From Swiss-Prot:
Gene: atpF2
Main location: membrane
Coiled coil spans: none
Its membrane topology: Single-pass membrane protein
Source species of the chain: Beijerinckia indica subsp. indica (strain ATCC 9039 / DSM 1715 / NCIMB 8712)
Matches recorded under Pfam families: ATP-synt_B
HAMAP family in UniProt: ATP_synth_b_bprime
GO MF assignments: proton-transporting ATP synthase activity, rotational mechanism; proton-transporting ATPase activity, rotational mechanism
Name by which UniProt lists this protein: ATP synthase subunit b 2
Length: 187
């Protein structure tokens, strides 16, 4: 029952969304009370001045210093980066020049070594050719001597064989001078 009565009483009274009844309402909300406007404006001005003083004396100089330091750091870094970039370009150019010089030296050294090896090879080839020519001449001389010796032996063998053949057919030994002359005429 008490609950029904409370519901009935609350239905009779109109409440706002804040749960405060309209009827029998007390004083108005202080910021909306016109009698409080002057002190509120004074406190607003005092708060604004204190906030302004705090910002201008402490916060803004500190932010300005930070911004100034940051700008100086950026300028310094940019200057340093520019200098390093220039140094890098110089180093790259020097490296390219060094590589080109090394290539030129390597090519010159290779050509020099090639010419030196070619000269040594030609000298060895001429020496071998001269040695072979000398050996060939000596071999030809030996062949000529051997041929002459063989021919003299052949002549002697031919004389003996011819003499034996003539003696076999005729029964007498042939004259050595006539036999030699006949063999020379046939050769």
């Amino acid at each position: 029952m008490a609950q029904e009565r409370a519901e009935h009483e609350s239905a009779d009274q109109h409440t706002t969304s804040t749960g405060v009844p309209h009827e029998g309402q007390g004083e108005p909300f202080p910021p909306f009370d016109s009698s409080n406007f002057a002190p509120l404006l004074i406190w607003l001005a005092i708060s604004f001045l204190l906030l302004y003083a705090l910002m201008s004396k402490l916060v803004l100089p500190r932010i300005g210093g930070i911004l100034h330091t940051r700008n100086e750091k950026l300028r310094s870094d940019m200057h340093e980066a520019t200098a390093l970039h220039a140094q890098a370009k110089e180093a790259a150019a020097l490296q390219e020049k060094t590589i080109a010089d090394a290539k030129a030296k390597a090519i010159a050294l290779a050509q020099e070594n090639q010419a030196k090896l070619r000269a040594e090879s030609d000298a060895k080839q001429h020496a071998v050719e001269a040695e072979l020519a000398a050996k060939l001449t000596a071999a030809e001389a030996r062949i000529t001597e051997t041929k002459a010796a063989a021919m003299s032996n052949v002549t002697a063998i031919a004389q003996e064989a011819a003499s034996a053949i003539v003696q076999q057919f005729t029964g007498k030994a042939p004259d050595a001078k006539k036999l030699t002359a006949a063999l020379k005429a046939k050769a």
